[in-house]
Amino acid sequence: PSEPFLACLDTPRHREIVQWFTCDKVLTDPNFVTGGASVTTDEYTEAHGGIGICYETGEASDTSRVNQVIDDIRGLMAHLKITCDESRPTPLREREVFELVGQIIVTSNGFRFAEGWGKQSWEPFNEGDVIGYHGENPLVMSSTGRLVFPKPELYWTEGNRVGCLARKLNQ
């Protein structure tokens, strides 16, 4: 299973809500790196005055976190005074907050991940790391960050994304 995370903006209003969810990471995309425009459900909700949050809990076939998600929602609802649940948990600690800053796109030269890269989301990289190649040209990281959403090679086609790059916002 993949590591759970919350996808949303990073504002005080959002932090009030995300404190009730059991995961360690928040991924924000204020510059629409993933879609080039407002294309996700959380972005749509934001565009219409709501607080949009997407709780990515893992692969669709992995139902091991269902009870935890229910508990998280109950805690949030009690906090918002939608229910009178006296057994609500306490808010969670600070999370790591990351911002999407770029995409890795397959070029006419193709693409391949360097040995050991592209196996899972949230892989940390450092400035100077070579994480892949466009043909024979290395993809060298210009800063520290994380590789997120690496796609299996089956889905790699010219002009399409094979992964995204994120930088940590809070230290």
Per-region residue spans from a language model:
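Structured catalytic-domain cores with a bias toward divalent-metal coordination
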Residues: 1-171
